[in-house]
Structures are given as structure tokens and as C-alpha cells.
Amino acid sequence: MRGAGGPRGPRGPAKMLLLLALACASPFPEEAPGPGGAGGPGGGLGGARPLNVALVFSGPAYAAEAARLGPAVAAAVRSPGLDVRPVALVLNGSDPRSLVLQLCDLLSGLRVHGVVFEDDSRAPAVAPILDFLSAQTSLPIVAVHGGAALVLTPKEKGSTFLQLGSSTEQQLQVIFEVLEEYDWTSFVAVTTRAPGHRAFLSYIEVLTDGSLVGWEHRGALTLDPGAGEAVLSAQLRSVSAQIRLLFCAREEAEPVFRAAEEAGLTGSGYVWFMVGPQLAGGGGSGAPGEPPLLPGGAPLPAGLFAVRSAGWRDDLARRVAAGVAVVARGAQALLRDYGFLPELGHDCRAQNRTHRGESLHRYFMNITWDNRDYSFNEDGFLVNPSLVVISLTRDRTWEVVGSWEQQTLRLKYPLWSRYGRFLQPVDDTQHLTVATLEERPFVIVEPADPISGTCIRDSVPCRSQLNRTHSPPPDAPRPEKRCCKGFCIDILKRLAHTIGFSYDLYLVTNGKHGKKIDGVWNGMIGEVFYQRADMAIGSLTINEERSEIVDFSVPFVETGISVMVARSNGTVSPSAFLEPYSPAVWVMMFVMCLTVVAVTVFIFEYLSPVGYNRSLATGKRPGGSTFTIGKSIWLLWALVFNNSVPVENPRGTTSKIMVLVWAFFAVIFLASYTANLAAFMIQEEYVDTVSGLSDRKFQRPQEQYPPLKFGTVPNGSTEKNIRSNYPDMHSYMVRYNQPRVEEALTQLKAGKLDAFIYDAAVLNYMARKDEGCKLVTIGSGKVFATTGYGIALHKGSRWKRPIDLALLQFLGDDEIEMLERLWLSGICHNDKIEVMSSKLDIDNMAGVFYMLLVAMGLSLLVFAWEHLVYWRLRHCLGPTHRMDFLLAFSRGMYSCCSAEAAPPPAKPPPPPQPLPSPAYPAPRPAPGPAPFVPRERASVDRWRRTKGAGPPGGAGLADGFHRYYGPIEPQGLGLGLGEARAAPRGAAGRPLSPPAAQPPQKPPPSYFAIVRDKEPAEPPAGAFPGFPSPPAPPAAAATAVGPPLCRLAFEDESPPAPARWPRSDPESQPLLGPGAGGAGGTGGAGGGAPAAPPPCRAAPPPCPYLDLEPSPSDSEDSESLGGASLGGLEPWWFADFPYPYAERLGPPPGRYWSVDKLGGWRAGSWDYLPPRSGPAAWHCRHCASLELLPPPRHLSCSHDGLDGGWWAPPPPPWAAGPLPRRRARCGCPRSHPHRPRASHRTPAAAAPHHHRHRRAAGGWDLPPPAPTSRSLEDLSSCPRAAPARRLTGPSRHARRCPHAAHWGPPLPTASHRRHRGGDLGTRRGSAHFSSLESEV
């Protein structure tokens, strides 16, 4: 018996007695006796199916209450269709092995559908045991309290182990919300090696790494409670953090807190948070009346925080009923789906039924009971648990300071002020309740950050109403968390830090500053007066009435009363573009100045010797080019407005000076107009101005039209001031008062309010921050009734003196000024720079008008000097070397500017070449009409082509010109240079052979001339009918072509005349090229008549200058000659005679003269006259070959010779034979001392020869020729002429050339080109010069 009853003997009877007691008391019969039995289908109350739930308690504390729980829980939990039958069982064993054995024995002897478990041991091993049993038997097990609320390992597969408590992760989440709410971002984690400490540290890492809050984790301390108090104290002091999160077993908490107290890490300034179910609720079972003591009896430190379930103060029956309700609601769902309650496992040693548990698990995951959500996650914890934050007070009781509902934390204010002394616990002597009122920029209220749910660092938490109760009633509104910042909030934070107090900030409910209504004060003043608040701060104005009931600090902001209005947009006048100048200036400008200056310019131009008066006086064509007064006005008008319109510029120097001064005047006029126009074109903004509150607009608003509408915010100091001083004004403005400042500003912008009267500090801020800067305070922020903002305190408060001293310190340290720049500044400024825009009057523009008057006076002086020089002084200037030097210097300056290449050194003259006999060109048909060429395009082109480069063309001409003259484009050369010309053709129509290659020639001088004619040329045929036509030369002789070096183009409306030159000197006769006109050929007349060697260039013989000056006899000579004779002379002008010299010798000409008087002349030569008889004139062979000397219209002799057909003039007395007589007949008197003469220089003596031809009785005395474009060096080769007798009759005079080499056959006079301008001595054409434009 001993062996059988040895050690197990005492346990056997006890176990048997327990099982018998359970069997006798069990409400679950093994088998139903009948249809109405308990076990049959119809068992239970009223046909409801029985639901057996085991209530298992572990610990001796539950023995007294376990027997009474069954009926109470069954009555609390009622489920339709189920008969809930709870059975309470108490387990004495506390170790894990004993607990497992007892539970397995219990389940094997009972048929239950669920288990509700609670223990008071808080042993961490209980949860894994229950989780294993649920997975093994598929029974739903609900843990409601104790150590079962901690899962140390992942749940077993198929387990339905559910927990109503909070997990470590959920507790840490709530704790971090509290830390974030109070800006406690720096902390340290303290843990022991208790089960679950690694999960605790990992959860902390997850929460801090993924948060937007800047957490400062100082590290983790892993303590060994058995190491001794000194070691623990040293470890706790090693980390300087005032927030500490503790995770340990309940037995390990006592040595940790003793070491912290020894190290001075508890009490004021330090906060401890306990994490884990074994520490939650403090000592004991957490009952409401149980003191929070450690297991050893030591008290917990004050200020300790913990997180518990919301029902932590509920009794045992209510906690158990919640667990039974979870099982009942899940069973009801099973019965609804399957129609019966499935049989669950009751044997712990049976085969695992995990697959069945997985299918039943989902019925218990989403439960709702008693208006509470019991939804569980995969770990078996509630998804949305209802938690509370409890704190240990000084009276050693737990206080609920916050709640956690639906993932939202709500805290009771205050715990400790964020901006008081750091983490000081609540001290009634140093804690203040502060009331404030929202009013920008002094107090700005904003919601909390939507992401983090906290206030940013420059703001503080503030609530909407005051709540002093610890446990507010359920129907009371919860305080809404807001964030306050602004100018006054920054001052409050500085005061709290300087003086050393904590505060609780809240907003007044009525939103007023303070006013006494029916004997009761409201607003912030009422909160302080009735002692609901210790202090009131904000835009609170100090006045006499308020100072009677409360004390005010020194003012920290100067303010008063100001008036704000809105800018109204103006309109732009239709005549705004005329407003920059006064009407007098406009009249002076366009009526007087423009007209007077235009008439002045026209008069100067008309009377100018170089102006358009010659065209008016001598123009043969009606409607010719004239500078009229209309053109003068048009020119000045275009200069005023900078319009690029076609205008005709004056030519006179005086007129040009006047136009230049007018242009300068126009620049000043237009610039002043443009600069002043912007001020008048903008929309002028209208701002109503008042002088103060006593202004007539405020005192008598009905007299205005429309009446002025103004108001203020009632119940403030502004309304009090107006009511006391201006009662009539107050009674009028009551209808326009606004409830808030923001609404008043909206009414101002909408035009429903004309003026708003309020505190100056607030209005100045609103004006600076207004969008669009449409609001402005009158008088640049003018303040009336100056006062200030102060802090309201109780009468006789002990805080007044410290606050006054602190505010004075802030003012002295410029902290207040810094805050004003931060909060009270804006982008809109009232002190706008006033732009004084006024019309420019005569006084403003007098200077430019004076300038015009001075310019007109100077122009008169220039005008007089110009006429004096032209008519008097220029004839008194004799030929001097100074003039030659000036002309040469002018040419050199032009050559530098035009990048003219330096001429190569002179080469020795080549031997003279024999001249071929001239061949008569074949007659050609009359030329067709030439295209019209504008007058300004008629030009003389001078260039040199490379010998042997082929026939001349348009491209070659342009290239040759630009190679020599550079990139300049002289007026009128555009048409001549760019036109391509066809290759010359012979009589048979075949192209002529290119000329033979010749040695390179020296570059020509840099000069050209553009001749402008006034009338179209007359047809050449029929001008001299008395001249017979010469015989045609052989056609085959038109092969030798010389390159044209100069082309003289006249502006003709008639077809151009054919070539008429009797020699082909390409340098002295520029139009003798193939393209110059007509077919030509080479060959000689008379078989092989030897040509005399020319004496020019290499050996210049004495040769007088040919007098080719036009005279009025041109028309008479043309009429005397028949058109047939002139037509017969046309073929004599061809260009197929080669120039006898290989190259031009000597430097370029150094002096140039006008060529406008030479437009109708061409030169001939004695030696190249065709050997035929008939009327002819004597020519100097060398002087006739001058380069730019035009050929004469005709060579004139006496009418006797003309009447005789082919004439033979008598020889002079100094000559013998026929030839000297011919030369004498064409001579002219050498000297006329009483008249100005043209100078002819000779190599021997440079004695000038002056003569002027005048018309006399029986003859013509022609005026001297104007100086030509020939250089004086070429003219110097002509010797002084011998005396000649004066000819009579309308004849052309010519110098005799006494040199022997100048003898030759006579030449009939060339084709006459009618002169369009009349007498060249009284006419000036439009000649343009490249290096010098002068008239001598």
C-alpha cells in the first residue's frame, strides 16, 4: 500500500475528490434522458442549446469570488439560441508544469466549448501554455488579466488564444504619443533580461525609425538586478536622459527603483514609464483601493506613468463577462452556419487538430458586445483597444491623465508645461492658468499637425475650454487640442523660462477682450476677475475701466486707435496721353516751333547757294526736284517722332545746322514726354483720408454723399473710447459694427464698409499682410488715443513685479523689437513714396526752346558767311600750293578711311607704240529705248580690270571696283556695278575675240564722280544735219578690244547714243570698251598712214588746254548743225583702238575738281582723226586724251567753214602752210587781264592762263571751264599756248597746240549732246565726290 500510496498517495484522494465534486456540480449531463433532456436536441432553457464555458482562475485570491461568478456572468451574457452555462474553477498551482497538468485533467473530464482564464501571478509563462492548449484542443481561450496578456513567442498554428489586455507594442505606441505630445523627444530604454526584453527593444527601434518626430534615443541599459544597488546606480547615471522607459518583471522593479532613487534620478525633473503587463497597475491586483506598492513594500516614485486597458478598474465579474461574451458570440455564429455546436477536443494527449481549429478560428475574430468592438488581429490582441494613461500622484494614488480610443490620444491638461522648467511636476505654487484670445498676429490658433498630431516647435498646446475635473462626465465635450503661436505666445514662453513657472493655456469661450455687461465682466478680463485664470495675455488694451478690477503689467506694445480704409481703383482719362505737357507746351511745340523752324529751314535752303533754289530758278522740267515748305514740315515731323519715313534732306549748310538742332530738340522733347507719360497712364488709386476721430466725416457722416459707413468690433477698448468721447458717432456706427476683425476686412474689400476703426497695432499688421495690398491705414498708420497692450493679473498678484521686471528686461535687450520684426512686419508698406506727377509747363521746357532760338541766330550767321564766301571771297583766292596741299591731304584722309592700298613705285616709261590706222566701224541699227535709270543712280564708274582677263562684264566691273575702293558704296553706283552686260559682238553677230593680254596697269586714282542731269537727253540724230556721215569701216576689224576703265552714265530718258570716239584709248577714253556702245573695229584709214609718236606722258610736249566750257551757244550750235551730219558722226565714236601706252605712269592725281560742268563734253585728239575731208576742228592730241575729260558736244569753228561744208580755216600768222592755219582758226585769245581765268600749267613755267568767253558782237566769248576731275599733274603736261586771235560767231574755241606732233587730219565735230541745265556758269548739278566736294 505504501508503494502504491507512497508519494502519490496524498494527491490521489485530493484529485478524486475534486473530480467527484465537479461531476456532481456539473450542469452538463452525459446523456439526455429524452427529447426534453438537457443533453438532447431540445435541452436547455426554452429549447436553447447549452454553451459550456469554463472560468479558470489561477491563484488563491479568487477562491472566495469564484462560486458567485457563475449566475452573475450568465445573467450578464445573454445570447439568442444559446444557454450560457459558466463553470468557475480555481487552480492552486502557480508553476507552469502544475498549471498544464491541472488544465489538461480538467478538460479531459468536462465537455466545454470555451475557456476564460485570469490569474494574478503575472507570470510570463502562462500565455505560452494557454496558446499551446488552444492549438492542441481547438478550444477558444480568452485571457482577461494577468500574465496571460503577454505573448512571448509567435502563436501556434490553429490557436484561438485571444487576449483582452494590451500588448507591449501597443503600450509603447501610446507612450510615444504621450512623449510626442509634450515634446519629450530624448529618452533612454532601461530593461532587464526578463522574457520579452528583446521584443521591447525592437519595437522601440521600429517606432523611432519610422516617425517624423526627431526622436533622440540615448541608448538601452540592460541591468542585472542581482548585481547590487551601487552597480545599478552607476549604470543608471551613465546615461543623461530625463525620460526613462522601464521593462522588467515585477520582482525586478524594486531593486531598479531603489538604485534610481539612490542616484537621484526620481522625483522632480524625471519621468518613468513602466511597460509590460507585469508592472501595469502597480502593486497588488490593481484594485481601486489598493496602494501602489512594490512587492517588498517600497512605494513607487511619484510621476510614474503606465498604460492599462480602459477597464482596469472594473470588477472581476465584468472582466470575466467580457471574455464569456466573446466565446458566446463566436458560438452563435457557428450555430448559425452549421446548425449545431461542433464537438471540440478534450484530451491534451490526443492527436493535434490544427486543421479543425483553423476553420473555427475566424468565428471568434470580430465580436461586438455592449457597444464595444472586440476585433482581434492575427496575434490575438484587440485591433482597437481602449487604453488609458495613468500617473502616480503625490498622494500615492493612480490618476487617469489620458485615453487612447480609435488610435487617438486625448490627454488631460496639464501634466507639465512644455515651456516651464523642463519636466517639472505639477506644483500648485508655480503653475499658472493662462487665458488668451485669438487675434492675429498676437495670438494665432491653428490645428495640430495632421500627420504627427502634435504642435510644431514654435507653438504651444492650447485648449478650447477649461476643465478642472479629473473624471469628466460622459456627456461633457472633450477639450479640443489646438496649437497657439504668435507675438504674445513668444512673450509668454520667455516669461515662463525667465521667471520659472509652468502654465496651462486655454482660449476664452466668448471670444472677447472684456466688457462689463449688466454688471458682469466677460472675455479675458472676466476670466481673471472671477479667478478662473491666473493671467490673461493677448491684444489686451490697458484702459482706466479695466485697471479698476485687475492689475496690468507694463505695456509691451504701443498701440492706440487707427482707421483702415480700402484703396479704390481709379480710371484713366481718355486724354491721359496729352497730360504730360500742359496745353501751352503743346501749342508752343506744334503750332509755333514746328511751323517757325520749318519755314526757317525752307528759307535757308531756298536762299542757300547750294540749295534747291537753282532747280526752282533754272529747272526746265515742271515738277522737278524742289525742297518745298511741305517737305520741310514733313522732315521735322519725322524727326520728332523718330519715324523712318522717306524724307528729302536739305543741302545747304545753314539748313543742315537747323535740322541737327531740331533733332536734338526732338530727342529732349520725346524723352521728357515718355518719362512723364507713365505717371498719367496708370490707374490712380483713391484713398479716403481723415484727420482723426473728430473729423467731420466721422462726426457728420450723413452730410457726405454717399454717407460714410464705418464701424468697429464691440466690447473692446476702441468702442469704449468712442462711446465715452463721441456718443453721437457711437450711436451711428453701431449698425456697422463687425463681430471680428477678419469679417470687417472682408467688408472693407467688398465695399460694404468704408472705414474700420480698431487697435492700431492690429490694423497695421493686417495692412502689411493683406493680399494685394488693398488695405491701408490712413495717415501712414496714424494713431489716436495712444495706449498699450499689457498682461492682466489678479489684484495684488505676487506675479506682477516679476513679470514687470522681465518685460522691462526684454525691452532693454531689444527682444521685443526682434519679435515685432518677426510678427508685425509685412510686404505691404503704408509709407509709400509719393510720386509727384505734374504737367510739364513752359517753365519746365524753356531750355529747349531757348536752344532753338540760339540755333536760329547761329544759323543766320552761318547763312551770311556762306553767301559771303560763295559770292565774294572764293574768287579772290588765287591758285596756291596750300590749296593743293589741302586737297591732297583730304584725299589721303579718305584713302586711310577707305583702306586704299598704297600705289606701287613708278616704273620707267615704256617706249611709245605705233598706232594703227583707225578703221571705220560698220553702221549699226538705231538703238532701242534704254531702261529708265533714276537720277540719283546716274554715275561715273572708274576702275581697272586686269588685262587679258576676258571681255568686261557686270561682275567684273563690280569686283574691280570693290577690289580697288573697298566696301564703300557711293551714291548712285548700285545699278552700274551690279548689272551684267552681254559680251560684245561683231557685225556678223559673232562674239568678239577677247583682247590680247597686256602688261598689268597701275591702279587708277581713287576718285569717281556721279553726275545728275536735270532733263532727258535729246536723240543724237538730227542735231547737225550739215555733217555728212563717214564711210563705214570694215566689219572684220572689230576684234581688238581694250578693257574699259571708266564708264560715264547719264540719266537719260532717251536711248543711249552709240560709241562715237575716234580712238580706243581705254584709260583716257573710258567709254571706248566693247560695252560702251556700238560696234567698232580696228584698222586704219588711208592704208598705212604712219602715226606720229605721241609726246604725252613719257615726253610731254607743250600743249595748251582745250577750252571746253559750255555756253548758251550750245543750243544755237545744235540747231545750226543738221541731224543728218550728227547721225553720220556717230559711227566715228568706237572703242577698238588700243591705247598706245603699256601702263599709266606717274603717281595718282593729287588734285580733283568738279565734273558736273563736264557732263556734256568729250575730248578728241589730232592724230586719231579719220583721214577724210570736211568740217573739222583742231585738237591737242595729248590734252584730248585726258582720262575723265568728257568729249565736247561739237567742235566749233566759224560759220564760214560750216557753210562751206568741208572748211579750211586760214592759218595763223606764225604758221606756214595749211595746218598752222587750221590750228589758228580754233585758237582763242590768251590773256584777258580783267577777267578771272582758268589756270594752265606748263613744265617750263607755271604761268597761269586766265580767260573768260563772253558773247560779243559778231562772236562768242565763252567763260572759262570749271576745274575738272583731272589732276593737275596730267594738266601740267600741256604747254603754254601761243597767242590766238579771237574768233567770231557762234563757234567753239579751242587752244592751239604748237607742238609738231599734234598735226593731223581734221576731225568733224562729234555728236552733240544737248545740255539740259543751260549755262553751266549759272547752274550747279548734283555732283557727289568721293574725297572732296567743293566749288572753286
Curated annotation (Swiss-Prot):
State a GO cellular component annotated for this protein. postsynaptic membrane
What happens when you mutate M845V? Increased glutamate and glycine agonist potency
Q: Where is this motif: PDZ-binding?
A: 1334-1336
Q: Where along the sequence does the record put site: Functional determinant of NMDA receptors?
A: N642
Q: Where is this region: Disordered?
A: 900-934, 981-1123, 1225-1336
Q: Which residues carry this modification: Omega-N-methylarginine?
A: R1316
Give the Gly residues compositional bias ranges. Answer: 1074-1089
In the UniProt entry, what is the domain comment? A hydrophobic region that gives rise to the prediction of a transmembrane span does not cross the membrane, but is part of a discontinuously helical region that dips into the membrane and is probably part of the pore and of the selectivity filter.
This chain's protein is named Glutamate receptor ionotropic, NMDA 2D
- Protein's organism: Homo sapiens
Gene it is expressed from: GRIN2D
